[in-house]
Amino acid sequence: MVQKGVVFGVLLILFICSTLTSADSKPNPTKEEEPAKKPDEVSVKSGGPEVSEDQYRHRCCAWGPGRKYCKRWCANAEEAAAAIPEASEELAQEEAPVYSEDQWGRRCCGWGPGRRYCVRWCQNAEEAAAAIPEATEKAQEAPVYSEDQWGRRCCGWGPGRRYCVRWCQNAEEAAAAVAIPEASEKAQEGPVYSEDQWGRRCCGWGPGRRYCVRWCSNAADEVATPEDVEPGQYGRRCCNWGPGRRYCKRWCHNAAEEATLKAFEEEAAREQPVYSEDQWGRRCCGWGPGRRYCRRWCQSAEEAAAFQAGEVTASLMLIMFKACPCMGPVPSV
């Protein structure tokens, strides 16, 4: 009974597979044949210039500069054929100066420095032609000002003309800035100060002139500072440097405090032995192996002298115990 069921199942499966195979081999009447290409499309493609098509069967009948993008799409072959003579006339026409167009058909009638960006866009050829005399007049102006994307002019440059410290909104404001006597006075002053974008002057440089530690708003704020003293960002002076002048251990607020500290340093230099000080004024009166770290810090000179005397006594006792083993075990120092 089981064998009959297995045979019946195998036959049923074979029948179903043969039915599906025959159904796939029959032609599908609902499938539409691909329409043949129209003669006009073939004729346009065979002629020149060739036109690229997109996924909607639109044709590009006007390319942008360098063929990087399409400025105009044509819906059919008739419109593309009509656009070809128009494109040929535009190429043959000599325009001076030549303006680049964007994807909306606008023309650039005002370039920024180095032609890196456009500062003015014209909607049509008439507006572009009207902008040509204006651009010629601007080119003949002296001095020459660089414009940004908002049409402002730079009437005050920083050191080396690397950045602009003052922007003028129009030609009148720029002309007034040129006639300012302050600009010529600044050029003749010494020492020369670098200015930032707010017109402030640097009257205090950090180590190696890598950064400014004090900015002056006007000539009255500029105070002559000795070259060997480097003011901090709060107007304080460093009157005690750390090793290698890598950091400041003590800041002085005025000249009197600095003179007092110098007198204290001269007095400490005459003392023997010389102790190293930290940023809190403490002295190291006990060094570790190789003087790599300090084992004990003393608050005053008296404490340092007492510790030194005790250290010398302990060293003598250690030498005596080592020289005479009969005196017992060596005490720990």
Curated annotation (Swiss-Prot):
Signal peptide: 1-23
Propeptide residue intervals: 24-54, 75-102, 123-148, 169-196, 217-232, 253-278, 299-333
PTM sites of type Pyrrolidone carboxylic acid: Q55, Q103, Q149, Q197, Q233, Q279
PTM characteristics: The N-terminal of all peptides are blocked.
Chain spans, region Disordered: 23-52
Keywords linked to the UniProt accession: Antibiotic, Antimicrobial, Cleavage on pair of basic residues, Disulfide bond, Fungicide, Plant defense, Pyrrolidone carboxylic acid, Repeat, Secreted, Signal
Positions with biased composition (Basic and acidic residues): 29-43
Domain of life, source organism: Eukaryota
Subcellular location: Secreted
GO cellular component: extracellular region
Primary location: secreted
Cystine residue pairs: C60-C70, C61-C74, C108-C118, C109-C122, C154-C164, C155-C168, C202-C212, C203-C216, C238-C248, C239-C252, C284-C294, C285-C298
Biological processes per GO annotation: defense response to bacterium; defense response to fungus; killing of cells of another organism
Function: Plays a role in the defense of the germinating seed against microorganisms, by inhibiting the growth of a range of filamentous fungi and bacteria, especially Gram-positive bacteria. Not cytotoxic for cultured human cells and are the smallest known plant-derived antimicrobial peptides. Peptide IB-AMP4 has a higher antifungal activity than IB-AMP1.
Description of its domains: Contains repeated alternating basic mature peptide and acidic propeptide domains.
Protein name: Antimicrobial peptides
Organism: Impatiens balsamina (Balsam)
Upper classification of the organism: Eukaryota, Viridiplantae, Streptophyta, Embryophyta, Tracheophyta
